């Protein structure tokens, strides 16, 4: 199961863990993903999407229909 946002396609990013002695080691910053169920009135159905908290805020602001239209234009199969 990929740790990717179903709407934006964003996955984990890489960076460094920095200790007190300033020694750096590689690490991954994982997305804050949640599996949510959304109702799409125009299609009269529910969809289950794995979305990050950032995407969830965008959906609350713009609405699920507008966000899905943008994602489909960018080539994501939602």
UniProtKB/Swiss-Prot annotation:
Annotated Pfam families: Ribosomal_L28
GO cellular component: ribonucleoprotein complex; ribosome
Span list, region Disordered: 1-33
SUPFAM superfamilies on file: L28p-like
GO aspect biological process, one term: translation
Top-level division of the source organism's lineage: Bacteria
Keyword Transferase among UniProt keywords: no
Polar residues biased stretches: 14-24
Keywords carried by this UniProt record: Ribonucleoprotein, Ribosomal protein
GO molecular function: structural constituent of ribosome
NCBIfam families hit by this protein: L28
Annotated family: Belongs to the bacterial ribosomal protein bL28 family.
The protein's name: Large ribosomal subunit protein bL28
Gene: rpmB
């Amino acid at each position: 199961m990929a740790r990717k946002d179903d709407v934006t396609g964003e996955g984990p990013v890489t960076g460094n863990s920095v200790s007190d002695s300033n020694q750096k080691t590689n690490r991954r910053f994982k997305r804050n993903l949640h599996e949510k169920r959304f109702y799409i009135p125009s299609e009269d159905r529910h969809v289950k999407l794995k979305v990050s908290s950032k995407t969830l805020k965008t959906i609350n602001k713009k609405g699920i229909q507008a966000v899905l239209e943008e994602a489909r234009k960018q080539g994501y199969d939602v």
